[in-house]
């Protein structure tokens, strides 16, 4: 492994999670040079756990969250603060413009570069697809042409999710989350653009960049009621720290069809800034959206990460 720079202790974030001592005792023995993967739902404290492991054992905190890559969202995505990023090595945070195309394939290529640096990676996030691509490989699916993406946006808006599901090939429909509009639209686009279903492309997956057997994989499984309270409290902190101003800064170039617009709370606060709903309704809707997102994450992790070491909270 590469020689690491001297570090000062990591500062405390307004969203910081104090890792319970009983949770640290549940950790398996982790050799200092072994890659670590940490998955967990939003607001579960996974970023603080990653920082703790890097502070204690060295390495770099590597982002595996699809929204924390965007430069426009530090507060709404709960990205580490500037002070936290300066105190410990961090990679792949806030480096993508809001209007840029960024996919799991882009992330995987950048992670390959991070692994080549030689620092022990502690890869942390809530985007299950990133971890799946990292440890299981990712199919080389051709880029979706803009006209197909536009047609998919229009189809979803006009016909609805159920109709798009009905237009998928049976093999793909049996494998993806049919309640997730982004996943359904992506599968629809692939079928229209290539004439082959997403499942067929995925059957030609390349070898994984980091096989699960070569890493210590941790998944946080919080109590749902405990997590819901943390989600609500954290959003209040985000608002107090200037989340509304962050969204206001993004408003002139706001495009709801962009992946960056999927930041939890952004559509709701945009609606308020446009005079469509009162602030209290926007905040309540954002909190609800966060809790619903966390539920989807927990389901995904439960179904796909059965071989990962569980950390139960609180």
UniProtKB/Swiss-Prot annotation:
The keyword ATP-binding applies. The record marks 127, 149 as: Interaction with substrate tRNA. Monomer. GO terms for molecular function: ATP binding; tRNA dimethylallyltransferase activity. Pfam families: IPPT (PF01715). Residues 1-25 are annotated as: Disordered. Keywords: ATP-binding, Magnesium, Nucleotide-binding, Transferase, tRNA processing. InterPro entries: Dimethylallyltransferase, IPT, P-loop_NTPase. This is tRNA dimethylallyltransferase. Substrate binds at residues 42-47. Its EC number is 2.5.1.75. It is an enzyme of class 2 (transferase). GO terms for biological process: tRNA modification. Belongs to the IPP transferase family. It catalyses: adenosine(37) in tRNA + dimethylallyl diphosphate = N(6)-dimethylallyladenosine(37) in tRNA + diphosphate. ATP binds at residues 40-47. Its cofactor is Mg(2+). The gene is miaA. Catalyzes the transfer of a dimethylallyl group onto the adenine at position 37 in tRNAs that read codons beginning with uridine, leading to the formation of N6-(dimethylallyl)adenosine (i(6)A).
């Amino acid at each position: 492994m590469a020689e690491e720079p001297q570090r000062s202790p990591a500062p405390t974030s307004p969203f910081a999670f104090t890792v319970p001592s009983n949770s640290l005792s549940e950790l398996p023995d982790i050799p200092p040079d072994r890659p670590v993967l940490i998955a967990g739902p939003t607001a579960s404290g996974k970023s603080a756990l990653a920082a703790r492991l890097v502070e204690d054992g060295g390495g770099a905190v590597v982002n595996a969250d699809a929204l924390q890559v965007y430069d426009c969202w530090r507060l709404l995505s709960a990205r580490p603060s500037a002070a936290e990023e300066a105190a410990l090595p961090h990679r792949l945070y806030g480096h993508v413009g809001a209007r840029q195309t960024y996919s799991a394939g882009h992330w995987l290529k950048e992670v390959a570069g991070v692994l080549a640096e030689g620092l022990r990676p502690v890869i942390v996030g809530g985007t299950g697809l990133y971890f799946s691509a990292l440890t299981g490989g990712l199919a080389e699916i051709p880029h979706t042409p803009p006209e197909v993406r536009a047609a998919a946006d229009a189809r979803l808006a006009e016909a609805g999710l159920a109709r798009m599901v009905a237009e998928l090939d049976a093999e793909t429909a049996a494998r993806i989350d049919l309640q997730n509009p982004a996943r359904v639209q992506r599968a629809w686009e692939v079928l229209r653009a290539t004439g082959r279903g997403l499942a067929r492309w995925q059957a030609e997956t390349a070898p994984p960049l980091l096989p699960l057997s070569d890493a210590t994989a941790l998944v946080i499984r919080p109590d749902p009621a405990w997590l819901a309270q943390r989600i609500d409290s954290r959003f209040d902190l985000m608002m107090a720290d200037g989340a509304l101003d962050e969204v206001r800064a993004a408003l002139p170039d706001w495009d709801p069809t962009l992946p960056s617009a999927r930041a939890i709370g952004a559509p709701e606060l945009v609606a308020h800034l446009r005079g469509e709903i009162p602030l209290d309704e926007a905040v309540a809707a954002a909190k609800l959206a966060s809790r619903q997102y966390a539920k989807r994450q927990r389901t995904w992790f439960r179904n796909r990460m059965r071989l990962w070491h569980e950390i139960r909270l609180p």
